[in-house]
């Protein structure tokens, strides 16, 4: 489909973007790869919820507990989500070993594929200009990269990809009804990943199919029947296997706690007002919002321009319903829930990138249609400056807030060969630190209070981690230190 933006150029700019789409897409995907994979092994494992998935996946890979996943060797009833994310991480561990990269590679790959899918679909739906600019924005969206998402082992990156695939499948199903059958595997994957969070894409599907209407004589029921079967069968297989293991001990809380309680009450202190998510959006993504405001200032939206901004949707009730439902479920559902956390906004980021990219595309179309070349240069500079600022923010966050070097985990990883098979003591082990020691390095975590407790409990050659400046004395010998901690060995 051609790129029909709010301003009509002579076709030269549109043709130029089309001609350079492949090169531009490669560059955008390269940027996304850098932002998602660079230093993936040099960032600290977080306590919530990355460490929970890490330990359960490592135990699954080691012990084969694929149906009833465990935590510290016992069936896990705290994490009430189905096991797809644990399965993916465990398969990565079995294939390539337990490392910080294999822990996160499934999420990082899912986020990278989200950028790819958004660009390929947006080119068909809205043209090359919108596609490339949307992909660029999404590749450098802080929340999409860091907030429980692409660079962590949590479920949110894959969930965002699956919601986007739901939108793409519904869009394609308008002209090719049998493509709706793909909704089955997508919805099944969402349930096996996030349980009752499947309601978000399910509400989207029902809204579009019921409200959006259909063409006269169109037969959807064979494809929708296939979709229903492909949704139910994988879910029923896993639910039956889990029920045979422990009855309703897991399945009951999966519904009651992870859906009813999370929706009706603010769990674990995660509260917020109706402005919680708008506030998070402006706090984390003010650079792209300011750049969008500059584009609107340079090329003001008259009534005619605003009407034609999304001309591809004009006169198409199905597409309009899909666009409205996509925006609605990704914004209204998290807002209505009583439990509010920043990463519930992750499925919204592809449509956020599409909206921002479309405004930039409109600006470039207007610039080509007018004689004000300086506005085009200002808009180009604004987009590039915004990208540079966001990239700087991402790298700064990686090197300062998430850097593993000055943590307990960094100390352990620097001495991984020394500590393999050894006992290491600490006052209290955090889950994330224990995962690194026991599953990445192959050591054994033990607890003792202070240097005195360590000396009493330890054997000759055991190790202890103490905060700076502790660790001096005849009973222990310094092995390595960073800014905050010391790794010491009991003196022979």
Describe each model-derived feature in a short phrase.
Residues 34-38, 52-77, 84-87, 91:
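Extracytosolic helix-loop segments that constitute the early lumenal/periplasmic catalytic or substrate-binding loops
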Residues 386-490:
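Short periplasmic/luminal acceptor-recognition loop of GT-C membrane glycosyltransferases, typified by
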Residues 13-14, 124, 129, 163-182, ...:
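Membrane-interface transmembrane helices that cradle and orient dolichyl/undecaprenyl
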Residues 338-369:
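Hydrophobic/aromatic-rich transmembrane helices and adjacent perimembrane loops
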Residues 21-28, 118-141:
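Transmembrane-helix signature of polytopic, membrane-embedded enzymes
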Residues 53-59, 185, 189, 193, ...:
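Transmembrane-lumen/periplasm boundary regions of multi-pass, lipid-linked membrane glycan transferases
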Residues 105-126, 165:
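Transmembrane-helix motifs of polytopic, lipid-linked glycan transferases
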Residues 117, 158-175, 186, 352-355:
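Specific aromatic-rich, kink-prone transmembrane helix
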């Amino acid at each position: 489909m051609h790129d029909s933006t709010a301003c009509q150029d002579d076709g030269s700019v549109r043709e130029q973007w089309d001609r350079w789409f492949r090169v531009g897409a490669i560059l955008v995907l390269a940027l996304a790869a850098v932002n998602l994979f660079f230093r993936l092994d040099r960032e600290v494992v977080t306590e919530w919820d990355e460490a929970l998935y890490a330990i359960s996946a490592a135990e699954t890979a080691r012990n084969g507990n694929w149906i009833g996943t465990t935590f510290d060797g016992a069936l896990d009833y705290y994490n009430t989500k189905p096991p797809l994310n644990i399965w993916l991480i465990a398969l990565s561990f079995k294939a390539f070993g337990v490392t910080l990269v294999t822990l996160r590679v499934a999420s990082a790959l899912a986020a990278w594929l989200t950028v790819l899918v958004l660009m390929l679909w947006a080119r068909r739906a809205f043209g090359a200009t919108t596609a490339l600019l949307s992909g660029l924005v999404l590749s450098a969206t802080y929340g999409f990269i860091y907030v429980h998402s692409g660079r962590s082992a949590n479920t949110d990156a894959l969930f965002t990809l699956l919601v986007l695939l739901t939108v793409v499948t519904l869009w394609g199903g308008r002209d090719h009804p049998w493509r709706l059958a793909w909704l089955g595997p997508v919805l099944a994957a969402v349930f096996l990943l996030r349980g009752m969070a499947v309601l978000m894409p399910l509400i989207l599907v029902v809204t579009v199919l019921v409200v959006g209407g259909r063409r006269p004589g169109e037969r959807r029921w064979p494809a929708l029947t296939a979709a229903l079967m492909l949704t139910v069968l994988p879910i029923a297989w896993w639910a039956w296997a889990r029920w045979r293991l422990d009855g309703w001990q897991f399945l009951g809380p999966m519904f009651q706690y992870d859906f009813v309680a999370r929706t009706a009450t603010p769990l674990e202190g995660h509260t917020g007002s109706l402005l919680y998510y708008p506030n998070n959006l402006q706090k984390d993504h003010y650079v792209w919002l300011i750049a969008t405001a500059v584009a609107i200032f340079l090329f003001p939206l008259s009534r005619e321009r605003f009407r034609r901004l999304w001309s591809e949707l004009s006169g198409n009730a199905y597409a309009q319903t899909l666009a409205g439902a996509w925006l609605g479920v990704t914004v209204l559902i998290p807002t209505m829930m009583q439990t509010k956390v920043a990463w519930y906004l992750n499925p919204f980021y592809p449509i956020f990138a599409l909206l921002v990219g479309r405004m930039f595309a409109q600006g470039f179309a207007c610039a080509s249609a007018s004689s004000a070349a300086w506005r085009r240069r200002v808009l180009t500079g604004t987009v590039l400056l915004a990208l540079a600022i966001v990239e700087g923010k991402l790298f700064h966050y990686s090197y300062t807030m998430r850097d593993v070097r000055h943590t307990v985990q960094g100390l352990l990883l620097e001495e991984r060969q020394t500590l393999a098979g050894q006992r290491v003591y600490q006052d209290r082990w955090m889950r994330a630190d224990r995962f690194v020691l026991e599953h990445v390095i192959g050591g054994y975590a033990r607890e003792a209070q202070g240097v005195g407790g360590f000396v009493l409990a330890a054997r000759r050659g055991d190790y202890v981690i103490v905060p700076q400046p502790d660790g001096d004395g005849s009973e222990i010998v310094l092995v390595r230190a960073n800014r905050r901690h010391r790794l010491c060995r009991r003196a022979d």
